[in-house]
Amino acid sequence: MRQPHITALLLLPLLLRSGTEGAEAMRACGHPRMFNRMVGGEDALEGEWPWQVSIQRNGAHFCGGSLIAPTWVLTAAHCFSNTSDISIYQVLLGALKLQQPGPHALYVPVKRVKSHPEYQGMASSADVALVELQVPVTFTKYILPVCLPDPSVVFKSGMNCWVTGWGSPSEQDRLPNPRILQKLAVPLIDTPKCNLLYSKDAEADIQLKTIKDDMLCAGFAEGKKDACKGDSGGPLVCLVDQSWVQAGVISWGEGCARRNRPGVYIRVASHYQWIHQIIPELQFQGRAGSQQQQRDPRGWQPLAENSAPCLAAHAVLLALGALMLGIL
């Protein structure tokens, strides 16, 4: 007669896991353990951007991406023109150097790639894709997810954000060995100004590029600093309410670091519904207060609202406790 009691006990960890799995990434997201934010710096530090991943084809880096959950990476759709043979792809996590990833790095094969169905080619809207890993990764201080914003988060023009990647330092050069992860602080540019910049010095025989509603610009009107080839799919992150939140996915640009040609990113929040549809358990970061604040990241603690899933778990405990008392 005690079998239902045993069954309830066996179900308890499963129910708790299902109620808190999405919360695990939310509590861990956007809080790296290493801090060194030097404007104008180039080489990143180990563990400084723990969500940054290298997406590799036949063992060679070709695009960046960001870890958003134990089995999911966010990147650009244009990185995957052909996924007929998924076995050629793998993801490198926890690495600072591509050539010498080190003991904290991890290679994980790709299970599948989901590109946004509305993506229609380079410089078009919806240039986002989700890469599912074959096995879940364990979070460490070198491997952590970034937070994703819901539509309530507003990234204001002029806000300083950071872009990272192993791409080329210029249109002519390749990142020298051992290919250390690069970081760059860039200000956000509003859409009207970005469209104006792209209209300047435009060649008559080239179709004028326009910034769509789901795009975001960041960089400098004078050029000189920008993401480049090999950075595609990587994250543009901003500090919002004490957490690093991914504002954009590196999508396209006209050349690299050219005058009046800032980098163009896909707004993550614009594709909130699509991401949620594929990863329903993933939690998104909303605005904690009426105003966003940029603070010193040292000494961060998980946000209080992240405890909501724990309350749900407690409710499950109470319900199961009552059930077991009834059985006994």
Swiss-Prot record:
It comes from the Eukaryota. SUPFAM superfamilies: Trypsin-like serine proteases (SSF50494). It holds the Pfam family Trypsin. GO terms for molecular function: serine-type endopeptidase activity. Residues 1-22 form the signal peptide. GO terms for biological process: proteolysis. CDD domains: Tryp_SPc (cd00190). Residues 38-280 form the Peptidase S1 domain. Residues 23-37 form a propeptide. Disulfide bonds join 63-79, 161-238, 194-217, 228-256. Belongs to the peptidase S1 family. PANTHER family: SERINE PROTEASE 27 (PTHR24253:SF119), TRANSMEMBRANE PROTEASE SERINE (PTHR24253). This is Serine protease 27. It comes from Rattus norvegicus.
